Amino acid sequence: MRVKEIRKNYQHLWRWGIMLRWGTMLLGMLMICSAAEQLWVTVYYGVPVWKEATTTLFCASDAKAYDTEAHNVWATHACVPTDPNPQEVVLVNVTENFNMWKNNMVEQMHENIISLWDQSLKPCVKLTPLCVTLHCTDLRNTTNNNSSIEEKMKGEIKNCSFNVTTNIRDKVQKEYALFYKLDVVPIDNDNNSTNTCYRLISCDTSVITQACPKVSFEPIPIHYCTPAGFALLKCNNKTFNGTGPCKNVSTVQCTHGIRPVVSTQLLLNGSLAEEGVVIRSENFTDNVKTIIVQLNETVKINCIRPNNKTRKRVTMGPGRVYYTTGEIIGDIRQAHCNISRAEWNKTLEQIANKLRKQFENKTIVFNQSSGGDPEIVMHNFNCGGEFFYCDSSQLFNSTHLSNGTWWNGTGPENITLPCRIKQIVNMWQEVGKAMYAPPIRGQIRCSSNITGLLLTRDGGNTQNNNTNSSIEIFRPGGGDMRDNWRSELYKYKVVKIEPLGVAPTRAKRRVVQREKRAVGIGAVFLGFLGAAGSTMGAAAVTLTVQARQLLPGIVQQQNNLLRAIDAQQHLLQLTVWGIKQLQARVLAVERYLKDQQLMGIWGCSGKFICTTAVPWNTSWSNKSFNEIWDNMTWMEWEREINNYTNLIYNLIEESQNQQEKNEQDLLALDKWDSLWNWFSITKWLWYIKIFIMIVGGLVGLRIVFTVLSIVNRVRQGYSPLSFQTRLPARGPDRPEGIEEEGGERDRDRSGPLVDGLLALIWVDLRSLCLFSYHRLRDLLLIVTRTVELLGRKGWEVLKYLWNLLQYWSQELKNSAVSLLNATAIAVAEGTDRVIEILQRTYRAILHIPVKIRQGLERALL
């Protein structure tokens, strides 16, 4: 019965135990689940994230492929060599916004081209001495009697004479030169006279600089490149209009080769559209905005200056040579350009169709320029070193009806554009700067490809209700070279790579024993931008490979830039490109060091995935873990937490500082753990070495003391008979001391030669300690005595100086008192005498009436 009762009681307890066990398991599972939901901030290095930015671009070019003797204006010899295998990484599932009208690359290119143009003219000759009166007549014939002048060229060339200073400054001689009519203006406004006074056209507003003889204006393709840490996004949509989102995006380090062709109305030798003609404008409804047309097929334009010129030198003083046209050999004919009429009409029809779609099926009319500067009214470009101004009215003289029919008149197979030539040009519409292009010998021929147009739309028609409301008139435009560069740079934008990313994970940083790690981090940013369209989880797998490309790419780019800078050392000054390259070098290193500095501050040096102890706050983003890592790209995630990035960075820094402080405190407590290392077997060899050194030192010390003892005994006239040292007999005058007295044993007493290693070590150590003690005691006594003597002498000197000071102080006091007394006595005596004199004078004055009365009395008596 007793057993059954106990069994029943234990069954009750067993039931409670099972319930307790299940409760504990459930509580543990709940704790694990709750712990699993806790997310922590993790730092990732090498994430495919970028932001729009503006930075200094540098150039790359194949300058060696062109004439090495002629110095081209664009200074492409100072550029970095182009990459023979340029990388272009397609960004899948990426949509990016572009805006060609607000692209800093256009402004940079415009400023660079102007600066290069100005810099190429700096060492050239200023033609200020030519700003004199020119006596000009129309060129009627040449030295060849069989030659003739074309009717259109009559009056186009002026034969002018003028006075210039020779090599001797006070001597003037008469020279002559041929000028184009566009380059001179009459002074007396008399155009009918056969011999009129003229002046150069820009003398009243600008400083004219002659282009150096070997300067070439041939456009060489320039590739604009971004420094390390930046990249170019390229839109590959074939019908991209320049603004808005682009879904076919790739990333490159450099642009394609852009020829810096300076022209108006027609865009020459540019890039073509891949699918049909493309028209682009910032605002089609605003007639002030220029319309940029990109063709899909080129139209050939062949130009010629048939005149065979000679060039002569005119000296304008010491060190100044002016190049002018000497004479024209053969017939004098007008320069002109030829364009295929069929190709041009086909191109205009395609452009009209695009414009008709944009402007609601209206009739499209192309008309000539409405007026303005010659650069705007005519098609202006450079052909073989001469600046052509061609009349383009024949190109823009057609009507395209809304039903698809058009009218352009009839004519020969080719359209011939008459061209005039100017030698004095005012480039870039800048005030105060003009350039004189020296004449080119012989005939000039050039062939170009028309790849685009610059158009302007007449305003006002769409707002009227008359019959012309359905007509849109377009005229050739240009003049702002930014539109020329924009027609090539429309597909690019500069972005700044942001390789640092933060995201929530379930991993928390643990404090472990830290070991040194040497991790090489590597270079080109384009490699890891390839994962931009992937989800965050897929992109994080390739972080190591992507980040390792960073540093080698920077180093390679730096080496290329240095080689380009070295190529300019023979010049006295860097070109614009040299300065850009130096800026790019500094910028690349600065970006890399900045990122590495942040990684170091966060305790993540050498890591690509770095956990932290900062808990993730759901207020930053309330998306779930799976939603973040499985559905979002890094770019989307960056936009999600962009407002909290700086806050997260600060929290990571504070957490790292606290962790380092905790580690320092922990290491201070763990110092005692190092005591157990003394008993490690790896330390035994070191202990044996120390023991051997101690024994060797003691043996050497024993030998030294023995030799010193023998020498001391020999000096006292005693020679030991054996190694057994006997105790000397003591006389009554040298008591050893008794037990009650407790006196010290005599130092001259010696002990027997002991046996055994330990006894020998003990005796030697005792002897060493006693020897050191006695010597140190003697030295201390000597020092004490010396200090005592010096103190006594010093005290006596101080007392003597004090007494001397007191004596002289008393003497000075007595002297001062004596001087004061003498001065007081002298002053008192002087004062008494003055008072006495005053008293006598006063009495004398008082006695004057008495004396007078006494005198009168005597006189009366």
UniProtKB/Swiss-Prot annotation:
Q: Where is this region: Disordered?
A: 725-749
- The region called Fusion peptide is annotated at 518-538
Could you tell me which residues belong to the region V3? Answer: 303-336
Q: What ranges does the Cytoplasmic topological domain annotation cover?
A: 712-861
Q: Which GO terms describe its biological process?
A: clathrin-dependent endocytosis of virus by host cell; fusion of virus membrane with host endosome membrane; fusion of virus membrane with host plasma membrane; positive regulation of plasma membrane raft polarization; positive regulation of receptor clustering; viral protein processing; virion attachment to host cell
Q: Which cysteines are joined by disulfide bonds?
A: C59-C79, C124-C212, C131-C203, C136-C160, C225-C254, C235-C246, C303-C337, C383-C446, C390-C419, C604-C610
Question: Which UniProt key words apply to this protein?
Answer: AIDS, Apoptosis, Clathrin-mediated endocytosis of virus by host, Cleavage on pair of basic residues, Coiled coil, Disulfide bond, Fusion of virus membrane with host endosomal membrane, Fusion of virus membrane with host membrane, Glycoprotein, Host cell membrane, Host endosome, Host membrane, Host-virus interaction, Lipoprotein, Membrane, Palmitate, Signal, Transmembrane, Transmembrane helix, Viral attachment to host cell, Viral envelope protein, Viral immunoevasion, Viral penetration into host cytoplasm, Virion, Virus endocytosis by host, Virus entry into host cell
Region annotated V2 sits at 160-203
As annotated in the record, motif Di-leucine internalization motif runs over 860-861
Report the SUPFAM superfamilies cross-referenced here: gp120 core, Virus ectodomain
| UniProt miscellaneous comment | Inhibitors targeting HIV-1 viral envelope proteins are used as antiretroviral drugs. Attachment of virions to the cell surface via non-specific interactions and CD4 binding can be blocked by inhibitors that include cyanovirin-N, cyclotriazadisulfonamide analogs, PRO 2000, TNX 355 and PRO 542. In addition, BMS 806 can block CD4-induced conformational changes. Env interactions with the coreceptor molecules can be targeted by CCR5 antagonists including SCH-D, maraviroc (UK 427857) and aplaviroc (GW 873140), and the CXCR4 antagonist AMD 070.
The similarity comment for this entry is:
Belongs to the HIV-1 env protein family.
Q: What is this protein called?
A: Envelope glycoprotein gp160
This protein's gene is called env
